[in-house]
Regions:
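All-alpha amphipathic helical-bundle segments outside canonical DNA-binding/catalytic cores
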Residues: 87-91, 126-129, 144-162, 180-184
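Helix-turn-helix
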Residues: 17, 21, 25-59, 63
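C-terminal peripheral helix-coil segments that are non-catalytic and often amphipathic
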Residues: 1-2, 99, 134-146, 163-164, ...
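Hydrophobic alpha-helical connector segments
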Residues: 63, 67, 74-103, 157-161
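N-terminal intrinsically disordered/low-complexity leader segments
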Residues: 1-13
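Amphipathic, non-transmembrane alpha-helical scaffold segments
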Residues: 11, 19, 61, 65, ...
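Short secondary-structure transition hinges
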Residues: 98-138, 145-146
């Protein structure tokens, strides 16, 4: 039993190492240009060793994407569970989302580009968007309970804010504004979300 446990741990460690290196290579060359040979060479194993853990390049890429989704979800859940006021929580949520997204190249490109060769991407997008709406909704409900927000339709408001954040992902992480101060940019956007553009 002890040996089985050790073997299981070694197998998990090998799988995690392959995932780590595959993330780097996929992010550098993209899904279409990356081959299993590229990854096997980087891991310093034969291609047949990769098949012990993953059935195909698509299977490995799916595992990479799910790992990055897991990283993002974990970071956002930490923000959601913090004991901070709703406005600060919304700010931290947007900031964490964009800052983490900058480091998740594979998930970012999978969301932005139509990777038709990988059928699971659409399912990931839908679940990811649903999770985002759910988390934003939690912040909004908390804000109304604490008498800081006035919202009449939580679902519609959450969809609107989620869509606004999604629109910022590309320009603030990789586009024209990719090098600007993220905190300052988020503060400007949050001011518009919370107070609108009307002169007061």
């Amino acid at each position: 039993m002890h040996d089985l446990g050790k073997n299981g741990n070694k197998r998990d460690a090998n799988r995690e190492n392959i995932l780590k290196i595959a993330r780097e290579i996929f992010s550098k060359y993209g899904f279409k240009k990356t081959t299993l040979d590229d990854i096997a060479n980087a891991v310093r194993k034969g291609k047949s060793s990769l098949y012990y853990y993953f059935n195909s390049k698509e299977d490995l890429f799916q595992a990479v994407i799910m790992k990055e989704v897991e990283i993002l979800a974990h970071e956002l859940e930490i923000v959601i569970n913090r004991n901070t006021d709703p406005v600060d929580k919304l700010r931290d949520y947007i900031l964490t989302k964009l800052a983490t997204f900058r480091n998740l190249a594979n998930f970012y490109h999978a969301i932005e580009n139509d990777i038709t060769a990988v059928g699971f991407i659409d399912d990931v997008k839908v679940k990811y968007e649903q999770d985002e709406i759910r988390m934003i909704k939690r912040i909004l409900i908390e804000g109304v309970r604490k008498n800081e927000f006035e919202i009449y339709d939580f679902n519609l408001a959450a969809i609107g804010i989620t869509t606004a954040i999604k629109g910022l992902e590309m320009p603030l992480t990789a586009g024209y504004y990719g090098d600007v101060n993220l905190e300052r940019s988020v503060d400007i956007i949050l001011k518009i979300i919370c107070y609108g553009i009307m002169k007061r």
